[in-house]
Curated annotation (Swiss-Prot):
Biased composition (Polar residues): 490-509
Protein name: LIM domain-binding protein 3
GO biological process: sarcomere organization
Stretches with biased composition (Pro residues): 436-466
Assembly mode: Interacts via its LIM domains with various PKC isoforms. Interacts via its PDZ domain with the ACTN2 C-terminal region. Interacts with MYOZ1, MYOZ2 and MYOZ3.
Residues modified to Omega-N-methylarginine: R216, R512, R529
Designated gene of the protein: Ldb3
Species assigned in the record: Mus musculus (Mouse)
GO molecular function, one term: metal ion binding
PROSITE patterns the record matches: LIM_DOMAIN_1, LIM_DOMAIN_2, PDZ
Intracellular or extracellular location(s): Cytoplasm, Perinuclear region; Cell projection, Pseudopodium; Cytoplasm, Cytoskeleton; Cytoplasm, Myofibril, Sarcomere, Z line
Amino acid sequence: MSYSVTLTGPGPWGFRLQGGKDFNMPLTISRITPGSKAAQSQLSQGDLVVAIDGVNTDTMTHLEAQNKIKSASYNLSLTLQKSKRPIPISTTAPPIQSPLPVIPHQKDPALDTNGSLATPSPSPEARASPGALEFGDTFSSSFSQTSVCSPLMEASGPVLPLGSPVAKASSEGAQGSVSPKVLPGPSQPRQYNNPIGLYSAETLREMAQMYQMSLRGKASGAGLLGGSLPVKDLAVDSASPVYQAVIKTQSKPEDEADEWARRSSNLQSRSFRILAQMTGTEYMQDPDEEALRRSSTPIEHAPVCTSQATSPLLPASAQSPAAASPIAASPTLATAAATHAAAASAAGPAASPVENPRPQASAYSPAAAASPAPSAHTSYSEGPAAPAPKPRVVTTASIRPSVYQPVPASSYSPSPGANYSPTPYTPSPAPAYTPSPAPTYTPSPAPTYSPSPAPAYTPSPAPNYTPTPSAAYSGGPSESASRPPWVTDDSFSQKFAPGKSTTTVSKQTLPRGAPAYNPTGPQVTPLARGTFQRAERFPASSRTPLCGHCNNVIRGPFLVAMGRSWHPEEFNCAYCKTSLADVCFVEEQNNVYCERCYEQFFAPICAKCNTKIMGEVMHALRQTWHTTCFVCAACKKPFGNSLFHMEDGEPYCEKDYINLFSTKCHGCDFPVEAGDKFIEALGHTWHDTCFICAVCHVNLEGQPFYSKKDKPLCKKHAHAINV
């Protein structure tokens, strides 16, 4: 559906275009500035611009469309077409308001700023619905971070403080049941993201209780309990090697399993031990019983301080107790502690929130160096490798039937008056190519030359002409030459066996133009594309060049063009076959064309007058122009090869651009170019070296100055009379 819009000027109009003829896509509105004139005129993004001020945009390039819009006088009239693409519909799903789980360590009473315990308060939703029981231990609001108090407790008696013995006893008795816990009293601000109590025994116990409650809620089939999230069944690949190893380990005898559990209970995880057993390295770094006993001894640590800034845990927090004990200086214990740290870091993020590679790097000890574990990478041996078998050289020659087959000089001697044909080419194990001697040509009293279209070439009896590699001519391919050598030669398979090294030298002479008669003459300079040329006629003489079209000897008058010689009847236009002997021609794409065909198929189009360019072409702004069409917008003079500037879509010569658009210094009247230091004062622009006192010529940059008759003066000459 087309519609017209008229925007009231002046610009800016508030929309952006894309596309054009040079981009092979229609002009489209790609962006509309909110609140602009285009937005107020109900323009839509993606609409096609059909016409600008009544001019169709089908033949406009992107730059031409921009210039057309810029040249709009006061109002801009646009004819547009609605885009056929549907308006994109948002596919974003609405947010699901679901309760978020409480981080267990944030449920502990936090220290307030004055050192007292900060106690949470029950939510108003719990008071409003006394019949609803919610699991405060499992989930609560992420904004209030409070648990819900039981309505029975709220109605029967006062709420006990968190630190009282009765509250502790009641909370311990309610851990195994579904009843909610007793909550503290009035609400106070709490601290969040506090790492205190993250790894305490109470936190781990609460996490286990949450998991058991979610399992019971799933097994009951009555829906989710207390806003708990569903637990998905894990997809187990029973064909994986790790799963088979786990099943095999679970089916071991009880005594072996107990021994396995005893060894892996204190040091490494079960998965890491299974992998160690599969690779055969489970006994590489086993500690002795002394290390097991010492590792179970509790170690006193320094108190943990809290900070407002979140900082990563120190590497010491991931060390085992054995590594922190003073007796851990022995090589064996250092190896055990490093192994424990490596296992803890490999077990996953549940074992340690920060994986630090430094404990592994410091785990080197003489015991570990004496019996290193086998590396998973490929071992490198310093010994000499086994000698590789000596490669055999096999050169395969690609034999193709060709019209031009060189013949050794010894096997080719044409006699006058006899027909001859080239000898069939027979490959040999190592043929040597010997060029024939220089051609000798003896003209007869009446030489005749008649080219025949037949494949067999029969020379006239008079001339004794011997072909050379540079100007060799042979007849059409014979039947034996056109067939592959493995058909015509019975010994081909023995000659070119894979075990033999064969080198075949072959030369294929392609038809090309005859070289210049005088090799020491001046070289032909390359001409510009689209330059008109004329062929030069030469009379018949003792000179016998080769034709650039048929590659035959020219006997009689000939033409010279593009550095080659031609038969007059064969130098024709490549398209219309018009003779180019006496007319101008243009060389294009390795062919010659007359003026009419060149204008029709190859001549560029001027960007201003939209006509064919048959003479000198000007290339500018990614377009082609007549030299008389690409001129300065001010003085209307052609640029030639000189510099020009673009301003508002129009080209200007350097002189007019400086006079019209450049900023000039008020002191020296020269333009202030890019990179020059300048000063703006007294309503003008100055070079930093031109802003001086009009009397004493002292530089006034950064100094207080006075003005008189629009001239700067220093403080000393501020009251000068003659300025």
